Swiss-Prot record:
Pfam families: Toxin_2. Disulfide bonds join 8-28, 14-33, 18-35. It is found in: Secreted. Its main location: secreted. Expressed by the venom gland. This is Potassium channel toxin alpha-KTx 3.8.
Length: 38
């Protein structure tokens, strides 16, 4: 995944930030969102 500068506590929090970044499938890893490119 691609780390983005968004803090998180759970993967559901990353869905929208990843969409906003033009990506999908957000996951929370080490307190930060990681996204999968389209």
């Amino acid at each position: 995944g691609v780390p983005i500068n968004v803090k998180c506590r759970g993967s559901p929090q990353c869905i929208q930030p990843c969409r906003d970044a033009g990506m999908r499938f957000g996951k929370c890893m080490n307190g930060k969102c990681h996204c999968t490119p389209q």
